[in-house]
Amino acid sequence: MSGEQEPDDSYARVRAVVMTRDDSSGGWLQLGGGGLSSVTVSKTLQPGDSGGTEFLVHGERLRDKTVVLECVLRRDLVYNKVTPTFHHWRIGDKKFGLTFQSPADARAFDRGIRRAIEDLSQGLPASCHGESETSEDGPQVNKEDHYSTHNNDHFFRSDSIPTEELYRTSVIRPSPFENLNPRRAYIHNQVPLKPIRHVSFQDEDEIVRINPRDMIIRRYADYRHPDIFRNDVDREEPEDVTFFTKTDSKKPSYLYSPANGRDSLKEQKPVEVCKIQPTSSLKKSKGKKEDGEHSSCVYCQERFNHEENGRGKCQDAPDPIQRCIYQVSCMLCAESMLYHCMSDSEGDYSDPCSCDASDENLCLRWLALITLSFIAPCMCCYLPLRACHHCGEMCGCCGGKHKAAG
C-alpha cells in the first residue's frame, strides 16, 4: 500500500500514540499495548503500473519498528479534534485516533492532514520530480518547474517565498513556424491568457507551513464544525511581468532554432526569460527581512519578526486574560452540562455559544444555558467580556505573543 517515499512528499511528521476505537465500551484504547510511534502524512506512488498517487498516514512504533497505522486518505474524511492532544478521524466505517505528546504536535499533524486533503481534492499531478513532460497546452517544461509553477496559485501563499532563493528558469520550445527573436520571451500560442506564476520554494517549507490565521481556532471545541475542506483565502493575482537577463548561470541554456530545424540546438549565453512574479509580495518579504530578526514560534511553529511581535499575534499562545474570562464566567459548568446531556456517541458536543442553524439542538442548548445561568449568574458575563477581549486583541492589548524556540 505504501510506495517509496520522497522527503519532499511529506506533509507532517510527529510522534504520537496510536489509538483504536473500542465499540463495546464506547471509548478509545491504546493499540497493541501502546508506545510512541512515528506518524507521517505523505504522498506516495500507488503500487503497480497505474502511476497514480495516494495520500497515506503511516505509523511505525519506535521501540520495535512495527507498523501500527496504515491509512489511505480519502475525500470523505471526517476529522475531529476532541482535546488539544487527542484527535481522531473517520473514513467510511473505519476510525483512527492519535494521542500526541504536545498540542504543537497535534496542530502540526492537523495542518498536514488539511494540506493532504486539499491536494487530494485539487488533484495534484502524479509526479513532481524527474524528467521533462509535455503539458496539456503544448510547451514542454521540466516536471520540477511545472510543479512549482502549477500549484503556487492554488495552495501556497507567495508572501512566504524567501527572497534570497534563486528563481529556476524554464525555456519553452517555440513552434517551428514562429520567428526566433532573442529579445522576446517565447510563449506558445495556445497558452491560456492567465499568466503562470513561476517561483520556487525551500524544501523544508513545503512540509507543513500554513498560517494559523487561515483557520481561526479559539479553543479545541471548534472541532465539531470540521472545516478541513474549506478553501484557503483568495489567492492574490500576479501584478506585473518582469523581463531579466540571466548572465551568471553556470549551465548554458539552449533554444531550438527554427532556421536549422527542430532537432538542432542553439546555445545562447544571455537568455531573456519572461518571469511573472508578485512584486508587492517580494518587496514585502524583503522589507520584513530588513526590519529585524526572524525566529520560529514554539506554539504555532510559524516564523515571526521580533520587532513586530505583540499581543494577539499568536492564536495558539497561552492567553492569561482569556483563561481568566473562561474561569470567571463559569464556562466549565456549561461545557460539562453539554457533555453529559447533549453529546453524541463519540462524546462530541456543540460549542456552548454557537449559533449554527444546522444544529438540531440549537434551541434546546440555548434554553439549557439560560436555565443554567439562573444557577450561575456569572455565565451572563462571558459574552460581554469576550467581546471586550476581542477588541483588546484588535488593539494589541490582549492575546498571546509569539515565543522564540530555543
Curated annotation (Swiss-Prot):
CDD domains: EVH1_SPRED-like. The keyword Phosphoprotein applies. PROSITE patterns: KBD (PS51488), SPR (PS51227), WH1 (PS50229). Residues 124-154 are annotated as: Disordered. Residues 195-247 form the KBD domain. It comes from the Eukaryota. Keywords: Cell membrane, Lipoprotein, Membrane, Palmitate, Phosphoprotein, Ubl conjugation. It is found in: Cell membrane. Palmitoylated by ZDHHC17/HIP14. Ubiquitinated. Its main location: membrane. One of its GO terms (cellular component) is plasma membrane. One of its GO terms (molecular function) is phosphatase binding. Residues 142-154 have a biased composition (Basic and acidic residues). InterPro entries: KBD, PH-like_dom_sf, SPRE_EVH1, Sprouty, WH1/EVH1_dom. Residues 296-404 form the SPR domain. One of its GO terms (biological process) is regulation of signal transduction. Tyrosine kinase substrate that inhibits growth-factor-mediated activation of MAP kinase. This is Sprouty-related, EVH1 domain-containing protein 1. It comes from Xenopus tropicalis.
